[in-house]
Amino acid sequence: MTPPAALGPVVLDVAGTQLTPDDRRRLCHPLVGMVILFARNFTGPAQLAELCREIHELRDPPLRIAVDHEGGRVQRFRAGFTHIPPMAALGRRWDEDVLDACKVALAAGFVLGAELRARGVDLSFTPVLDLDWGRSAVIGDRALHADPRVVTVLANQLSHGLALAGMANCGKHFPGHGWAAADSHVDVPVDERSFEAILAADAAPYGWMGTGLDAVMPAHVVFPAVDVQPAGFSPRWIREILRGRLGFTGAVFSDDLCMAGARVAGDVVASAQAALAAGCDFVLVCNDSAAADQLLAHLQWRRTPAFDERLARLGPRDGPPAPAQVLQTARYRAALQDLASLGGGPTPAR
């Protein structure tokens, strides 16, 4: 595999369903390493495949393409893709039948990963490892369960399904967004609990998943008992606790630096520098083209061997498979059948 030496730490979005001249200019900047897609970038599977082809052909080695495609209300692509139920449905199945829940979680990961890979998407920011404390509306049914042991087992199964489809995983939102009630898209959530309480519950899956966890996205949540900075800007959380105490060796993605929860660090350049200094490998800048241009003009960054190793671990190991290679296989059909028992099924193409 060609080493990803030409790719940088910035993750940007694009305007629409085709690349504009401004998109191309930004994506060809050496600081950019990845593109994140949203629902506005999608009209159907064929269009998505063509957009991904455009993006991949811009650079050598190709830019990585990511998406938030968890299932439930956070599933960016719908028409022509299988409906993935919210992750809480897997938790409810666990309460009824542990082994069946494990089987369906694996099927969900495989279907999710296979369908994205067949259209050219390289990475989905999933699984959600937040606990369902019944307090956070922005998390809510995105969480698998209230018990961190159950979350770990189901997330491992879902991640195994992703891996079978050739896709890495990304656990979020470290160390946990399930307790703080505020939404970090529009506010700065605060979790006042003790470090011991957070480590024993919310952060536990990040340690228990071990080397099976490829990437992590920290929360824009402040935990005053540990640090006055949100976790995504905190060397204590990322370097000392996530990497040092929990032994995590994969990539760390900041959450979107244009969210309200990230503004405590300053403008987009200051926020990106703070996130990278805290231990993030990649920084996301979404839905603000002026901020993206400002960041590309002023960000100071130095490549390290650790960055290249973590980027390579995210894959993919090769180009996207032809849809027929995956979507007409017996394994895919069996996974669809398993997922249907949870309410998953096809969404009609437009």
Name each region found by the language model.
Residues R78-E96, G134-L144, S184-V186:
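Surface-exposed, active-site-proximal loop segments in enzymatic domains
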Residues L123-A146, H173-E192:
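Short glycine/serine-rich loop/turn segments
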Residues Q300-R350:
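Extended, intrinsically disordered, low-complexity segments
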